[in-house]
Amino acid sequence: MCQAGEDYAEPVQRDPPPVPRPSREQKCVKCAEGLPVVVIRAGDAFCRDCFKAFYVHKFRAMLGKNRLIFPGEKVLLAWSGGPSSSSMLWQVLEGLSQDSAKRLRFVPGVIYVDEGAACGQSLEDRVKTLAEVKLILQKTGFPWHVVALEEVFGLPPSVLCCASQEPAGTEEAYKVAVDSFLQQQHVLGVEGCVSPAEGEEQIHLSHSQESLGTTGSPVAAQTEALSRLFNSIKTLTAKEELLQTLRTHLIVHVARTHGYCKVMTGESCTRLAIKLMTNLALGRGAFLAWDTGFSDERHGDVVLVRPMRDHTLKEVAFYNHLFGVPSVFTPAIDTKAPEKASIHRLMEAFILRLQTLFPSTVSTVYRCVLLSLLPMLEGSRAHGWGRLATFACLPPSVDPLPPYVLAEAQLRSQRAWVSQEIQEYLITDSDEEEEEGRVEPGHAQSCKAVKQEGEDTGIGL
């Protein structure tokens, strides 16, 4: 109520509430003692030691849970120089060290594929990049192989053949292999795992490093052929698909040549989520389980594994920064390309932008879709469907393609022609039913008995 002569004072000016800041008393969520240096997710602040233990455990758990790599096996590490593959190489290097609690028991090797010719790099830039690559690979102490993408023009047609694959070992077989390996090491007087000794395998240097840029050499001709192949393709989407296919064929060939039965790739969870959405857009949904799962067994005797599939790009970047993991920057085929230049770039921008707003986007997309693809994976293994997809994008003309691709295409064309020619002479189930309908019932039963007897004795009728 208003009162006469009352003095109304102006409202007291108050300072705005302070902006909340991270408390200096905040501790690591793991040990509750150390000061946090990394925040992976909201509320998940780790100190340096706990973050390293968390990161290493993810890598070890992925290998131990699947148990596809047996002790003493030769494993080829596909290293591109990027953050994820460099982190994978560093994990293997530390896992084989003497001070590791549970040392890895396989024998590693490293392969680097020089894609400079396909990405439009100059000769000087390629030589400089190879020098940095050689310096890092020599520090690892592993046998290493440097090959150029141009070498796909010298691959044999057998690289596309799916070699016979031994049945996957059970858990009991894995335990027996571990016990046998440890017993063998005890007999030899070596405690721990086998690490590649110096001189065990000679370093394989491809022509890309020995005679790179020699005019008139076969490498110069192959480089020109590779450039002509990629220049004949008009869309960036087709170029990226072709590059991925040729790279995989080259790595599988090197693995077979040098006796590697497993190939490790450094694809992270973020990268696989982007690849998953990209393959759906490209109409390759039937092969998602092979393209994004832990293992890819479509090549038969060489199995591709992805031990970094539980690590996000954010975790990889933090780990490499905190622990000084070396890497080599090499421009990709889509470097500086606009967002809508290809389906790959569009899906990458979409997933990363969504991940910024909703931090659980990558894990949700990846894990939910993979759960629905598990039955599809089992069905493709039973019927061999995963081996049908060889090439996703072809150039307007087949002339620039590598010889082994042309040979395989010609062979498949001949198979289709032969199958069409003999189609009318093949006996189908419907023909047998019609034949049985025209003969006497007793004669039909005797024919079935003779046919069953022939199948039981291994004689085909």
How should these model regions be labeled?
Residues 1-290, 294, 322, 418-461:
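ATP-dependent adenylation/nucleotidyltransferase module used to activate substrates
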Residues 261, 270, 274, 280-317, ...:
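Flexible helical/loop "lid" subdomain adjacent to adenine-nucleotide binding pockets
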Residues 359-431, 444:
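Cys/His-clustered metal-coordination modules, chiefly Zn-binding fingers
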